[in-house]
Amino acid sequence: MADFAATDQLLTREFNVSARRIEGPELCSLDPSLKPGLAGAFLYETDTMLRPERLCREWRERLMCRGVRFVESCEVLSAEKEADGIECVITSKGPMTADGYVLATGARSGQLGHLFGCYLPIQPGKGYSVTMPRPAICPSYPMLFPEHRVGVTPFQEGYRLGSMMEFVGFDEQIPSSRVEQLKRSAEPYLKQPHTDGQSETWYGWRPMTWDSLPAIGPASGLRNAYVATGHNMLGLSMAPATGKMIAAMIAGKGPELDPSPFDPARFARA
């Protein structure tokens, strides 16, 4: 518990985010889904959870109502540049022009950075999840078990385990061994860590950077091109702040947060 207490102290000191420390004997009273004998936990009562697929669907619907147009199954082939900016991007559905261009293509950003004249050493970090019916004794809270690097998310209609970090390129397979390993990871902590019914497996590629910081800011030498990628394992958490920073830059305003640590040009200087 000492290591986690140090993390809690840092979060309290730097961000005014503190947790309630719960010793082992109290855990089962807090959440009966937990096994007896655990050392303890830190409860961050302001934390919450969401289903990313539903959030993205809702974003899409709301943006379309505001006039945003989504062009799907469209491959970006190249970018035509003028003196100090991008004139248009050439796609499989024809040229597209805009006042500003933002490269926000997640784990694929390393393959597309050259369009903006950027060196982006972003690697795909593959993770897995399995979503299944809720167990009879289901956790009441979303939980992280750092020793086994597994996250537990209880939904109204289901229950999800997520974990893993593999550097295997853009591999699209979901090995059954990984799914079983994921299920086993929660067994030391939960009375009913998984259920038998119909389950849904998933994989995704996280955009990993070698210094664990995202790349947010102008593309070097281009007045109308910006980068917003490389958020590692915190893309959803950092999305709102990233959007505000990029919007401020495009509008010619100073962002509220110092963007220099996230400068995409740092990779070229390394």
Labelled PLM ranges:
Residues 18-20, 69, 119, 197:
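Conserved beta-strand segments of alpha/beta enzyme cores
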Residues 43-61, 107-108, 178-185, 235, ...:
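Mid-domain beta-loop-alpha active-site segment that forms a flexible
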Residues 15, 52, 146-147, 171-173, ...:
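C-terminal catalytic lobe of FAD-dependent flavoproteins
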Residues 23-24, 72-74, 200:
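Short loop/edge segments at beta-strand edges and connector loops
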Residues 67-69, 159, 225:
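Short, conserved active-site loop motifs that form the nucleotide-linked donor/cofactor pocket
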